[in-house]
Amino acid sequence: ILVPEKYGGSENSLTDAAVLYEELGRGPVPGPFFSSGILSVNILLQTANEKQKAEILPKIASGEYIVTPAITEPSYGWDKKYINLSIENNSLTGTKLFVQDGLSATHILCAVRSEKNKDSISIVFIDVNSEGIERKQLEGFLSASSEISFESVKITDDMILGDINTDQWDSLYTGILNSLPILCSYQVGGSQAVFDLSVEYSRTRKQFGQSIGRFQRVQDHIIEIVNHLDAARWTTYEALWKLESNMDSNTSIHLASAVSSEAYLKACDGGHTVHAGIGSLREYGLTLHTQMSRTLYHFLGDPKFHKRKIAKSLNF
């Protein structure tokens, strides 16, 4: 949806994408739609040269390529200092953790230390079927998070995006920032779905001869969900507006990310309190949101990470 027309995409706006992803979040619809169609596209637009864009983006738009970034490692963090995987003798050996949609991807955008300058970050475009790559699903209450291991994976200069002598960290980070409001929209959609489920259940579940929604304590939980939902929605809309209006949007994006991640998780907690036992049934659907909210809580930075970024931008 964000791929430019000259590369075979529809070149829609971020707001168009946000509307779509808010609806996908209501599902929540699984799959690499965000990882490949939003995040990877934005990273490629920032880091790849013209030849690489012309080769890769049309295949993402057509669905031939499913691409996902591999950034975090066992040291875990979303700042540059946490990237330790390094190109050595034109090969990679190491591990990337919490790679979203890593099992369904055909290619990965791997953030690594440059061989010539260890202070520099390079983005390497790697086919997952390359010799030396092993992928496995991470265990636990996670949605589509995987571990990717590299054992002497051969790296050539043409696999490195952009200028091989350029530090790509700032460009990578810009691609992430441009994608965050879309992720927030997905979380807003999920929070809205949890609210709708909770309100409907409070109307139809009877106890002591009346709907449980008449009890003040149940109303308190639903109001708390509403407060989180509204905070996430309006901070997300403001971030989108500022980003598309070419205003200074970094602080607003970090604020929306912190609020939306917290909102989705807290909305699910409140939803389970309203539903009680039935909410834990996989067939009911609430647990799908609960699992997704936990997965996305730390994806591209948890609320604590984004709050630190806000404080730094305010010179605290």
Describe these PLM feature segments.
Residues 1-28, 47-51, 59, 63-64, ...:
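Alpha-helical interface subdomain recognition
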Residues 93-133:
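A short core secondary-structure module
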Residues 31-41, 64-67, 100-106:
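FAD-binding core of FAD-dependent oxidoreductases
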Residues 78, 82-83, 98-99, 127-163:
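Flexible, small-/acidic-enriched active-site or ligand-binding loops
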Residues 60, 77-79, 100-104, 114-118, ...:
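Solvent-exposed alpha-helices and their adjacent loops that cap or buttress functional pockets
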Residues 29-51, 79:
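N-terminal glycine-rich flavin-associated loop
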Residues 85-87:
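A structural signal for short hydrophobic beta-strand segments in well-ordered beta-sheet cores
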Residues 62-74:
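A short, Trp-centered hydrophobic/proline-enriched beta-strand micro-motif
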